[in-house]
Structure formats: C-alpha cells, structure tokens
Amino acid sequence: MNFNNKTKYGKIQEFLRSNNEPDYRIKQITNAIFKQRISRFEDMKVLPKLLREDLINNFGETVLNIKLLAEQNSEQVTKVLFEVSKNERVETVNMKYKAGWESFCISSQCGCNFGCKFCATGDIGLKKNLTVDEITDQVLYFHLLGHQIDSISFMGMGEALANRQVFDALDSFTDPNLFALSPRRLSISTIGIIPSIKKITQEYPQVNLTFSLHSPYSEERSKLMPINDRYPIDEVMNILDEHIRLTSRKVYIAYIMLPGVNDSLEHANEVVSLLKSRYKSGKLYHVNLIRYNPTISAPEMYGEANEGQVEAFYKVLKSAGIHVTIRSQFGIDIDAACGQLYGNYQNSQ
C-alpha cells in the first residue's frame, strides 16, 4: 500500500516510515477514517498514545484540511461553505434523492478565470486551484458525519479539467484503501479543455464526462463562453467522438436554457444537426437541458426560464431521436443550483 505523497495519506505514510513505525500503522489510520469514521487523531485508540500525540503535533487535531464556515439547508439539499488555505472559500452541495441516493457536487477551484457570462463563480476570477486534499475533504467531511457517498460530480466552483490536482483526487476517490468508489460513480463537467479530455480518455475511461455546450453556434458560444475561441466546438466534439470510440461510454451534453438567447427552436434544430453528424449519429450523446438559475452575481443577467420554450426545445430533440432530459433543479432558494455557487458570499465580502 503506497499513497500519493501529494495527499495527506501519503504524507502520513512518509511520517510513519521516517519514525520507523510498522507498516500496518497506515492501514490502522485509514481504517479509522474510512471504516470507523473517526476524524480526530486523539480518538484513534488503536494507535499508541505517543503516536497519536506525534500525529496531532505534525498534522493537527483532525484529519480534515478544510474548515466548516456555514451551512444552508433546503428541501433535499445542503450547501456547505468551507474555508481552505490562504483564507479562501469554496462551496459544496449535498443532494439527497427520495430513493435514498446521496450525490455530492464538489468544487475544484476557488473561483474560475474562464468568464462564462451566466455563471456567478466566474465573475470573481480564479483565486486558487484547490489541492488534492481540499478537493477530497469536501466529500470526507460528509463521510465522517455518516453520509452515504453514492456519487460525486465535479460541477461545483471552477473548471475541473483546468486543475491537475483533480486527477490526483480521482485516484484517491477510487483507491480501494480510501474512498473505494467505482469510477462510474464519478462525473466531471468541462467547458472543453481538450488536453485534459484526452487524459481522461487515456487514464480514466470509466469516469463520466459532461461537456458544457450552451450554444451550437460557434460565434455565439464564444460570446457566452470565451474558451470557445481557444477550443472551438468542432474541435471539442471531435475529441469527444474519439472518447466515445475508445471507451464506448456515453458523453453528456449540458445546455443551459438562457431565455431569448439560446432557447429558440432554431437553436434546438442546430443542436440536432450538430449531434447527428457525430460518431454513430450521436447515439452515445445525452443532452441535459438545464433551466437558467438567476443570480445577481453573474456577469450578465437573464430572465427566468420559459417553461413552454424549454418543453418545445425538448420535443425537437426528442422527436429527432436525440437522448435528452430536462434536469430537475434543487436548491435554487439557497443559491445551490447550477451557476449560482459563491455568488452571495462574494457580494457580502
């Protein structure tokens, strides 16, 4: 058993070895954290008292590297504000489905520098990339409280594929000695960072991938999402086709419905044309239509989603044989929905 030395688990392992502790000590510690849900070194009674004191002196009282600042609750949703290093803050969302499933939407960056016009997170710029421990601790926090970890999505603050630490986090989440999750329980959303998509294909082929499209027209997409100038739609779609070819895995397409901007039937038909021209006529693409969530912190304001227009858009895609769903929304009242994270906290600083 050897852990990545970028992680707290690897650092603890190195510390134990440097102090000539027996190899089984690291297993005792990871069992205490992940099987017994013990967060404080002092409470790991399986360890000798002197070792517990040494761990506290070197790593702090608790195994968590992030600090709880605030919590908000809504029906089926809990949003938590954490403090990370450099006194920065990130948000994490826990969603409980009525069937008993628990999903976690986690952040990969504090802020974001890609400047999508409809997103509150991007309006503050990039403050820092989260470390691997700051990423995984968002889930560990809930695990230690007794929550069931069924699925994790990198759809919180930041562009996940712009932070290399995300790949280390994937390793920790799937490590059988740590979180022990199947890669199919993990989802990454990206605005289209081509080099990192290639890495996912090659090294993490079973992880679910979502591409944020939001407009089928390249010029319009560049206005909404400046990243399109660097990685244009067609180039990203070619890479996604290759991902599907090599992995035989479905790719999800996220499409935020911006009233009067990208929700016309013309847009719907163009999405159909875009996907039908892809590998296997787009049969392994699945479109998630997302109602726009108003937030005063986004660079531009759009109105409430027009339900009739959302339904009409859906029917165009459905009738053309495109796999499509309208995503259920949770946590809008506490700014925990798509595109809302960190907005109100930023305004209050």
Curated annotation (Swiss-Prot):
Matching PANTHER family: 23S RRNA METHYLTRANSFERASE, RADICAL SAM CORE DOMAIN-CONTAINING PROTEIN
GO terms, biological process: response to antibiotic; rRNA base methylation; tRNA methylation
Annotated consequence of substituting C119A: Loss of activity
Recorded GO CC terms: cytoplasm
Record localization: Cytoplasm
UniProt cross-references to NCBIfam families, sorted A to Z: CfrAB, PRK14453.1, rSAM_Cfr
Domain named Radical SAM core: residues: 98-333
Name of this chain's protein: Ribosomal RNA large subunit methyltransferase Cfr
Impact upon substituting C116A: Loss of activity
Function statement: Specifically methylates position 8 of adenine 2503 in 23S rRNA. Can also methylate position 2 of A2503 after the primary methylation at position 8 is complete, to form 2,8-dimethyladenosine; however, C8 is its preferred target. Confers resistance to several classes of antibiotics such as phenicols, lincosamides, oxazolidinones, pleuromutilins, and streptogramin A. The antibiotic resistance conferred by Cfr is provided by methylation at the 8 position and is independent of methylation at the 2 position of A2503.
Annotated catalytic residues: E91 (proton acceptor), C338 (s-methylcysteine intermediate)
Any Pfam family matching the protein: Radical_SAM
Residues binding [4Fe-4S] cluster: C112, C116, C119
EC number: 2.1.1.224
Miscellaneous field: Reaction proceeds by a ping-pong mechanism involving intermediate methylation of a conserved cysteine residue.
Single GO MF annotation: 4 iron, 4 sulfur cluster binding
Family as reported in the entry's similarity comment: Belongs to the radical SAM superfamily. RlmN family. Cfr subfamily.
Superkingdom of source: Bacteria
Cofactor: [4Fe-4S] cluster
The reaction(s) this protein catalyses: adenosine(2503) in 23S rRNA + 2 reduced [2Fe-2S]-[ferredoxin] + 2 S-adenosyl-L-methionine = 8-methyladenosine(2503) in 23S rRNA + 5'-deoxyadenosine + L-methionine + 2 oxidized [2Fe-2S]-[ferredoxin] + S-adenosyl-L-homocysteine
Keywords of this entry: 4Fe-4S, Antibiotic resistance, Cytoplasm, Disulfide bond, Iron, Iron-sulfur, Metal-binding, Methyltransferase, Plasmid, rRNA processing, S-adenosyl-L-methionine, Transferase
CC cofactor note: Binds 1 [4Fe-4S] cluster. The cluster is coordinated with 3 cysteines and an exchangeable S-adenosyl-L-methionine.
